[in-house]
């Protein structure tokens, strides 16, 4: 719906305050069946991350800084889909597609904040491995909470400032073109494109802000792991066991980065992706890492795997 004058121009300062999320609308009645795979994914996400968080909290063997960081990642992986997927499921099942401007801006903020925070967490994990492998004698000194805060405060402030700026600028726009967003949740550029005024600044910051954060973190992560691998190669084969967790972090980082870049490029450049494919990639960016990060860490990290097997045996005994 668009409110216009006879000449086809927007009436006064009219601005939509509610929007329709029409992701996958071209599927028609088949759209309802999307409830099943997305419900199974959010269920997997909730169960896998909850188990990982429970293990790290309750098992003393997993109370080292490395596992605490993995636990924080699991919390982020659990929270991020909560701001998006429940609304999607209601939309698929009952066609409840409307969202207020405030709700839309909140979704944008939390999705982008958690996304950039995950990137920053991977940076902290690389620092943890750097100190553990390259500076083992001073590891506990650097990883004490008071010492480690100096590494984490600056990235958190950076992420908050970038995301608050993006959301604040988007919230000041007038939306009088239409109120339909071709997505299953509110995405920054999807909302900005509906504005009936100049959005150059929004477009520039929307492109550069998250990209700069992810790129900066990726550069520091790459440098850290390059130093780690060089150090391990010089020290001999016996040290290769120490970088197993590094490889796990790299797998998680690569998996997340590929999904982020695919979703980023599909929405912000001219390409052959259909609207449904673009929406699919964006929803997978929110869901896939959250579902499979705890599984990757559980399978590849020996300490977590052993604690999970102990928990499984304990539950099995209680069930008998």
Regions found by a protein language model. Give the residues of each.
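Transmembrane helical core of 7TM receptor-like proteins
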Residues: 1-320
């Amino acid at each position: 719906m668009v409110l216009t004058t006879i000449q086809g121009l927007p009436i006064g300062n009219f601005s939509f305050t509610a929007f329709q999320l029409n992701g996958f609308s071209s599927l028609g009645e088949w759209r309802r069946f999307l409830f099943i795979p997305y419900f199974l994914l959010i269920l997997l996400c909730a169960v896998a991350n909850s188990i990982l968080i429970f293990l790290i909290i309750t098992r003393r063997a997993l109370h080292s800084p490395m596992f605490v960081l993995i636990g924080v990642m699991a919390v982020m992986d659990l929270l991020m889909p909560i701001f998006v997927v429940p609304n999607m499921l209601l939309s698929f099942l009952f066609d409840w597609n409307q969202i207020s401007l405030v709700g839309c801006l909140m979704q944008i903020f939390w999705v982008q904040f958690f996304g950039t925070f995950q990137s920053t967490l991977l940076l902290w994990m690389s620092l943890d491995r750097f100190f553990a492998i390259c500076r083992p004698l001073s590891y506990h000194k650097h990883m004490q909470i008071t010492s480690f805060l100096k590494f984490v405060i600056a990235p958190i402030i950076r992420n908050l400032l970038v995301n608050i700026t993006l959301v604040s600028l988007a919230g000041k726009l007038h939306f009088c073109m239409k109120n339909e967003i071709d997505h299953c949740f509110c995405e920054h550029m999807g909302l900005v494109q509906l504005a009936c005024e100049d959005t150059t600044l929004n477009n520039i910051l929307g492109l550069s802000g998250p990209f700069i954060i992810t790129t900066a973190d990726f550069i520091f992560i790459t440098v850290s792991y390059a130093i780690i691998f060089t150090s391990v190669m010089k020290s001999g084969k016996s040290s290769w066991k120490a970088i197993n967790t590094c490889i796990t972090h790299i797998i998680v980082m690569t998996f997340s980065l590929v999904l982020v870049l695919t979703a980023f490029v599909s929405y912000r450049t001219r390409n052959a992706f259909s609207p449904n494919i673009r929406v699919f990639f964006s929803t997978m960016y929110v869901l896939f890492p959250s579902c499979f990060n705890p599984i990757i860490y559980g399978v590849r990290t020996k300490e977590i795997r052993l604690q999970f097997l102990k928990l499984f045996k304990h539950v099995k005994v209680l069930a008998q």
